[in-house]
């Protein structure tokens, strides 16, 4: 299990944390930090990558998408979301990542955007 970014309290306390959990050891392990602090990011797994999608920061919503390669233990930038947003639903079907809904402005907002990417 992986935890990607997040926040401690309000939107101005976003994190770059990236951690994995081992149920056998009952322990979290810190991994390479996410490129850029973000709260409300979505995440999925596809093609050997843990993918961090969008998010928000005090200045607005985030459209950037990053993939963490489990083999190389490095982040790389992928194609940005056409519609930057936070709080998205993310799912992988047949290697394609689907990004559903979310908010287009920081705080409580909604979007009907549905987009997909092929990492």
What kind of region is each of these model predictions?
Residues 1-119:
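Kelch-like beta-propeller repeat domains
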């Amino acid at each position: 299990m992986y935890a990607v970014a997040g926040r401690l309290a309000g939107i101005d306390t976003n994190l770059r944390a990236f951690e994995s959990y081992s149920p056998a050891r009952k322990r979290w392990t810190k991994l390479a930090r996410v490129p850029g602090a973000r709260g409300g990011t979505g995440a999925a797994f596809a093609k050997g990558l843990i993918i961090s999608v969008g998010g928000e920061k005090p200045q607005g919503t985030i459209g950037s998408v990053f993939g963490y390669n489990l083999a190389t233990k490095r982040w790389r930038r992928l194609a940005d979301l056409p519609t930057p947003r936070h709080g998205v639903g993310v799912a992988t079907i047949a290697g394609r990542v689907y990004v559903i809904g979310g908010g287009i402005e920081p705080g409580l907002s909604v979007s009907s955007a549905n987009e997909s990417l092929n990492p």
